[in-house]
Amino acid sequence: DNPNSQIIKYLVNRGAKFEVHDEGYSGRTPMHFWARRNNYELLELAIKGGANVDMQTLLDPKSEYNETLLFEAVKEAETYRVTQLLIELGANVNFITPTSPLDNAKGSRNKKLLKDAGAMTSAQLDKKYNIYWDSEECEKDESYMEKYCKL
């Protein structure tokens, strides 16, 4: 065990969820940074300890552009182990922002992992579910947002 994982285990055992968003520009949680930096060991500890596998960034609470941990993981080809872990732990591979994780995936391993898990592009999701994006309406009307802005 490295010192960081020991600290995370300690915090998880005391109820930490690592779901506090950075109040600055990024709106990310520690888990988003771990996903982007290929730190699958800390992510696994946090998620198995009860953290949300589909935790979103929080740039704007009414924005449909909030991304999950999987979006962070697939942005780098080297993070395929994090991508695999998140899929194994139940991440939604078809979360749409209006782009999907598959649209954003870098590297053949990430793309293969997503496709094998049933991921679709945003165009495929739009066609299958007849999704209509009106971001202006999503920002104004919360009931519209709940019905049409999230899959």
State the predicted function of each range.
Residues 3, 38, 77-78, 109:
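Ankyrin-repeat intra-repeat helix-capping/turn positions
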Residues 125, 130-151:
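Compact disulfide-stabilized, cysteine-rich extracellular microdomains and processed peptide cores
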